Amino acid sequence: MQRNLVVLLFLGMVALSSCGLREKHFQKLVKYAVPEGTLRTIIQTAVHKLGKTQFGCPAYQGYCDDHCQDIKKEEGFCHGFKCKCGIPMGF
């Protein structure tokens, strides 16, 4: 039962991430909803990794360029699932 609740909670957090909620909100939710232990640590690590991932990078060709132009006024390059501003793929 607890495993089902954790999976449902995790899927709900993934669904809500498209609404503009930040990683710290999810970390706080995990802190209060999941008992302390190894499972909480694993979920917090997964939330942190998903929070750093930019899913638009491989799906949309100009995502990184638009992202980097807004932030640093540099050309953007997609490195896996992350955008790197001003760092071409050769590095």
From Swiss-Prot:
Residues 54-91 form the BetaSPN-type CS-alpha/beta domain. Keywords: Disulfide bond, Ion channel impairing toxin, Neurotoxin, Potassium channel impairing toxin, Secreted, Signal, Toxin. One of its GO terms (cellular component) is extracellular region. It comes from the Eukaryota. PROSITE patterns: BSPN_CSAB (PS51862). Disulfide bonds join 57-78, 64-83, 68-85. The keyword Nucleotide-binding does not apply. One of its GO terms (molecular function) is toxin activity. Residues 20-27 form a propeptide. Residues 1-19 form the signal peptide. Its main location: secreted. It is found in: Secreted. Expressed by the venom gland. The keyword Transport does not apply. Belongs to the long chain scorpion toxin family. Class 1 subfamily. Inhibits voltage-gated potassium channel. This is Potassium channel toxin BmTXK-beta-2. It comes from Olivierus martensii (Manchurian scorpion).
